[in-house]
Curated annotation (Swiss-Prot):
This is Cyclin-dependent kinase 11B. The lineage of its organism: Eukaryota, Metazoa, Chordata, Craniata, Vertebrata. Residues 17-60, 114-131, 138-227, 238-253, 264-276 have a biased composition (Basic and acidic residues). The gene is CDK11B. The modification Phosphotyrosine is found at Y594. It comes from Homo sapiens. Expressed ubiquitously. Some evidence of isoform-specific tissue distribution. Residues 291-302 have a biased composition (Low complexity). SMART domains: S_TKc.
């Protein structure tokens, strides 16, 4: 920088004059010297040496040149002057002083300029250092702030997870307390009911003892009177005339049972029927409050077993009392063997008359008890069971009766009783029970291939579900769809699949019903009434049970082909069951061509929407993925209005497939005929947000994979890490309970589309029961006791 400044310095006037003078002298010297040199060269070139030839080719003549010789000479002179060595010039004292002052002044200026330049550089460097320092300070502050924010976010996340964990624990504790409270209330009710029954039985036994004692005293008084009258009127007779004047018994046979024995048996039967009618009301109330179907069934069976044991104890006590009474009477009879035979004949006649009276009273009581009309099928089976019980007990009456005994015929029934009695049922399918043995409670819903009712078994008082099969072509034989459904559902028994008890039939071939265990809810109607969605642990529990049921079906080579939330049932115990096998069928390997129009539209796999005819278990797994999303959001995942709209909704969320991600996609029938809009990205993650973890979204993507060959199976789905991360699946017994919507009057829901080729004509499937033989659904007495009309038959 200093050299550049020296070249820029301003010259003084003296220096300029001296410079001009020096240049002028140099020019004059150069001119003289140039002229001298040019003359020498010309003289040399003009005179050729000996033997030298002039070469005209070497001569270059420049014509019309803008430069003149004088100009070139001047330029050359200037150059020579600048390069010439000048002799030292003589300066005066005054000039030297002036020159020294100039030099000092120049030196000061140079020093000032150097110092200013250095200060400027120092300031620039200082600014740069300050800038760097501030930049580092800002970076440190930003880093500290980011670290603080990260730490704060971690603390907030930990606090949120802690609050969420506390909330879940409080919720679980609350549910546990409620469950224990319900169990305690149930135990208290059962204890009170047992105490009430025991008290009633005790009072009944005391009343029977009083009646038997009263009858015994009356017989003794009457026998004393007869003895007194016969002692005065009738002569003594030999013992052999006892058979002739008696009731037809031989002398060696045992005496008939006392007259109160049939009456006691009939009273016990009346008591049993009263207890059964009480048990019906009690079991109904207990089932409404019970939280689990299995526990309610076990408690019901346990109460019935306890009741049977207590009744057996009563019968043993009554038989022991009767045996004691018989022994006393035999002793009295042995003492009176010496009396006349007329007394014995009158006594036997009195016993026969008392027996007839007791039988008449029993018939009257039975006529009063038979409020609900029963079929002969029920009555015959009941009479056979009563006969077996009487034979097993070995009562004196049954052992003492012979061919000669007189038993009066049953009295003729009145016209009113004839109207109450039902005609004998002749089942169309041998070995199946009649539908008359069930009492209809309400109509639940239409399935794919039939109508479902909630009913009660009249014999066991158990609540069951009756599904009436569609039999529109019964004249051509048994429908293949109904046969396939029965065969499939009987083959696929599993804890997470609806349990089939039996098949019952109506009056003719078009009334066939599947009897299944009653389950309180279906997930579709339950989610419509829930105010809050399922918790993550509850969703995992439901998905695990669903995958277990689907795995069992696929392991047995069964395709369900209609998995949706309305076909998934949930009990009060938190047990999920797969139902409605109207579209199910078996499949084999290699795959065959099936109809592509299966599965309800919202849950239909893309290969079915695009017209594929060869498909396998992957269609069920796509439906499982749609159900997974619906459990999280309580809304259908792809609610399309038509097949084209359904395809567009799937492509919009998952992206349009290609041959790369779906081999064979371009060969599908629908792809060849039409062009779909392009959606390059998968936008499904945005629909769930915080509702689904990364592992859960990974499982969702595997359920909703386009290529069926890469779609996850039910067995692999159960092994996914989503079910092992927190929050873990809850125990089914910890599920909350809701009011059973199926026990209320059916309300038509028009939200979910119907399955293909099923359900469209079934909304009036049970309406013709009012005109023909079969179920009669009475809406005026819904929820009545066993004495209500229930299922009524019309012939």
């Amino acid at each position: 920088m200093g050299d550049e400044k020296d070249s820029w310095k301003v010259k003084t006037l003296d220096e300029i004059l001296q410079e001009k003078k020096r240049r002028k002298e140099q020019e004059e010297k150069a001119e003289i010297k140039r002229l001298k040199n040019s003359d020498d060269r010309d003289s040399k070139r003009d005179s050729l040496e000996e033997g030298e030839l002039r070469d005209h080719r070497m001569e270059i003549t420049i014509r019309n040149s803008p430069y003149r010789r004088e100009d070139s000479m001047e330029d050359r002179g200037e150059e020579d002057d600048s390069l010439a060595i000048k002799p030292p010039q003589q300066m005066s004292r005054k000039e030297k002083a002036h020159h020294r002052k100039d030099e000092k002044r120049k030196e000061k200026r140079r020093h000032r300029s150097h110092s200013a330049e250095g200060g400027k550089h120092a300031r620039v460097k200082e600014k740069e250092r300050e800038h760097e320092r501030r930049k580092r300070h800002r970076e440190e502050q930003d880093k500290a702030r980011r670290e603080w924010e990260r730490q704060k976010r971690r603390e907030m996340a930990r606090e949120h997870s802690r609050r969420e964990r506390d909330r879940l624990e409080q919720l679980e504790r609350k549910r546990e307390r409620e469950r224990k409270m319900r169990e305690q209330q149930k135990e208290q009710r059962e204890q009170k009911e047992r105490e009430r029954r025991a008290e009633e039985r005790r009072k009944e036994r005391e009343a029977r003892r009083e009646v038997s004692a009263h009858h015994r005293t009356m017989r003794e008084d009457y026998s004393d009177k007869v003895k007194a009258s016969h002692w005065s009127r009738s002569p003594p007779r030999p013992p052999r005339e006892r058979f002739e004047l008696g009731d037809g018994r031989k002398p060696g046979e045992a005496r008939p049972a006392p007259a109160q024995k049939p009456a006691q048996l009939k009273e016990e039967k009346m008591e049993e029927r009263d207890l059964l009618s009480d048990l019906q009301d009690i079991s109904d109330s207990e089932r409404k409050t019970s939280s689990a179907e299995s526990s309610s069934a076990e408690s019901g069976s346990g109460s019935e077993e306890e009741e049977e044991e207590e009744e057996e104890e009563e019968e043993e006590g009554s038989t022991s009392e009767e045996s004691e009474e018989e022994e006393e009477e035999e002793e009295e009879e042995e003492e009176e063997t010496g009396s006349n035979s007329e007394e014995a004949s009158e006594q036997s006649a009195e016993e026969v008359s008392e027996e007839e009276m007791s039988e008449d009273e029993e018939r009257e009581n039975e006529n009063h008890l038979l409020v609900v009309p029963e079929s002969r099928f029920d009555r015959d089976s009941g009479e056979s069971e009563e006969a077996e019980e009487e034979v097993g007990e070995g009562t004196p009456q049954s052992s003492a009766l012979t061919e000669g005994d007189y038993v009066p015929d049953s009295p003729a029934l009145s016209p009113i009783e004839l109207k109450q009695e039902l005609p004998k049922y002749l089942p169309a399918l041998q070995g199946c029970r009649s539908v008359e043995e069930f009492q209809c409670l309400n109509r639940i819903e239409e399935g794919t291939y039939g109508v479902v009712y909630r009913a009660k078994d009249k014999k066991t008082d158990e609540i069951v579900a009756l599904k009436r099969l569609k039999m529109e072509k019964e004249k051509e034989g048994f429908p293949i769809t109904s046969l396939r459904e029965i065969n499939t559902i009987l083959k696929a028994q599993h804890p997470n699949i609806v349990t089939v008890r039996e098949i019952v039939v109506g009056s003719n071939m078009d009334k066939i019903y599947i009897v299944m265990n009653y389950v309180e809810h279906d997930l579709k109607s339950l989610m419509e009434t829930m105010k809050q969605p399922f918790l993550p642990g509850e969703v995992k529990t439901l998905m695990i049970q669903l995958l277990r049921g689907v795995k069992h079906l696929h392991d047995n080579w069964i395709l369900h082909r209609d998995l949706k939330t309305s076909n998934l049932l949930l009990s009060h115990a938190g047990i999920l069951k797969v139902g409605d096998f109207g579209l199910a069928r078996e499949y084999g390997s290699p795959l065959k061509a099936y109809t592509p129009v299966v599965v309800t539209l919202w849950y239909r796999a893309p290969e079915l929407l695009l017209g594929a005819k060869e498909y396998s278990t992957a269609v069920d797994m796509w439906s499982v993925g749609c159900i997974f999303g619906e459990l999280l959001t309580q809304k259908p995942l792809f609610p399309g209005k038509s097949e084209i709209d359904q395809i567009n909704k799937v492509f919009k969320d998952l992206g349009t497939p290609s041959e790369k991600i779906w081999p064979g996609y371009s060969e599908l029938p629908a792809v060849k005929k039409m062009t779909f809009s392009e959606h390059p990205y998968n936008n499904l993650r945005k629909r769930f947000g915080a509702l689904l973890s990364d592992q859960g979204f990974d499982l969702m993507n595997k359920f909703l994979t386009y290529f069926p060959g890469r779609r996850i199976s039910a067995e692999d789905g159960l092994k996914h890490e989503y079910f092992r991360e927190t929050p873990l699946p809850i125990d089914p017994s910890m599920f909350p309970t809701w009011p059973a919507k199926s026990e209320q009057q059916r309300v038509k829901r028009g939200t979910s589309p119907r399955p293909p080729e099923g359900g469209l004509g079934y909304s009036q499937l049970g309406d013709d029961d009012l005109k023909e033989t079969g179920f009669h659904l009475t809406t005026t007495n819904q929820g009545a006791s066993a004495a209500g009309p229930g299922f009524s038959l019309k012939f």
